[in-house]
C-alpha cells in the first residue's frame, strides 16, 4: 500500500519509514505540511501517518483537508508526542482513525497500520480470482473473458484492467496509474483517460455487471465492486452502455 508520512523530525521519519517499508508498504515522507498539501493534488495514497506540529501547515489542518476533499474511508493515523488525553480526544474527534504517541514502537505501529488498512480495504488483499462474477482472468495468457467470451484488449488495456480489479475501493490518481503502468508520470493524463474509456466500453464496466469506475474530479478514478444490494436488476428494457 502507498503511505504518506508527515513528520518533520528526520530521526522519527526514518523510524516510521523503515518500519512500514519492512511491512511491505511504499512510503513517501513529507517534512513540511505545505509541500504535502501540494502533492496531494497530484498523488494518491492509501493511508496517512501525521505528526501534529510540522512547519507551515500542521497535522490537524492536513487532516481537515483530507476529510473534506478525499474519500472518507481513507485511514489517518496520528503519531505524535502529544500524549495528553484531551489531545487524543481532539485528534479522534477531528477525524483521525487512530492515535499513537511517541516514542515509536515499531511492532505496534505495524499492527495499527495493518488493522486500519484491513478495515479500509477489505477486498484489496484478495487476489483476482478466476470467476469474479462474469469476469474471468487468465493470468498466464493475459486474457479476460466476459460471460465466456474473450475480450479483445490491447496489452496496456489488459494491464489497466488487472490493476483496477486488484485495487478495488482505492483512489487511483492519473499520476499513480501512469507511474505503475507506463513507468513515468511525464505523460499527458489524457493517455489514462483514453485507455479508461476504451476499457469501460470493452469490458462493459457498469453496475449491471457488479462493478463500476467512478471518476474523481481532478484526481483520477476509483474502481468499485458492488454488493448485490447495489447491483441493478437487469431487465429487457435496460439501455445499452
For each feature predicted by the language model, list its residue ranges:
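N-terminal/domain-start alpha-helical segments
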Residues: 1-121
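Short, Lys/Arg-enriched segments at the junction into DNA-binding effector domains
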Residues: 2, 114-171, 175, 228, ...
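Generic structural signal for secondary-structure transition and capping sites
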Residues: 45, 71, 118-122, 169, ...
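Positively charged, aromatic-enriched patches within helix-turn-helix-type DNA-binding elements
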Residues: 143, 148-155, 159-219
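A short linear beta-strand->loop->alpha-helix hinge motif most characteristic
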Residues: 209-241
Amino acid at each position: 500500500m502507498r503511505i504518506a508520512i508527515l513528520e518533520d523530525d528526520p530521526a522519527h521519519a526514518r523510524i516510521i519509514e523503515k518500519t512500514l517499508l519492512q511491512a511491505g508498504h511504499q512510503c513517501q515522507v513529507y517534512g513540511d505540511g505545505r509541500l504535502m498539501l501540494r502533492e496531494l493534488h497530484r498523488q494518491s495514497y492509501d493511508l496517512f501517518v501525521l505528526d501534529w506540529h510540522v512547519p507551515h501547515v500542521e497535522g490537524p489542518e492536513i487532516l481537515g483537508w483530507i476529510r473534506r476533499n478525499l474519500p472518507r474511508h481513507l485511514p489517518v493515523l496520528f503519531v505524535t508526542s502529544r500524549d495528553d488525553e484531551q489531545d487524543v480526544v481532539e485528534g479522534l474527534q477531528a477525524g483521525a482513525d487512530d492515535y499513537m504517541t511517541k516514542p515509536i514502537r515499531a511492532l505496534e505501529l505495524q499492527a495499527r497500520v495493518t488493522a486500519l488498512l484491513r478495515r479500509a480495504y477489505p477486498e484489496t488483499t484478495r487476489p483476482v480470482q478466476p470467476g469474479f462474477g462474469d469476469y474471468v482472468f487468465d493470468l498466464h495468457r493475459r486474457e479476460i473473458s466476459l460471460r465466456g467470451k474473450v475480450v479483445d484488449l490491447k496489452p496496456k488495456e489488459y494491464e489497466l484492467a488487472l490493476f483496477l480489479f486488484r485495487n478495488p475501493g482505492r483512489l487511483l490518481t492519473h499520476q499513480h496509474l501512469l507511474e505503475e503502468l507506463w513507468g513515468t508520470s511525464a505523460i499527458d493524463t489524457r493517455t489514462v483517460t483514453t485507455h479508461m474509456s476504451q476499457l469501460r466500453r470493452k469490458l462493459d464496466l457498469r453496475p449491471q455487471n457488479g462493478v463500476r469506475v467512478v471518476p474523481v474530479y481532478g484526481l483520477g478514478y476509483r474502481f468499485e465492486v458492488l454488493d448485490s444490494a447495489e447491483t441493478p436488476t437487469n431487465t429487457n428494457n435496460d439501455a445499452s452502455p
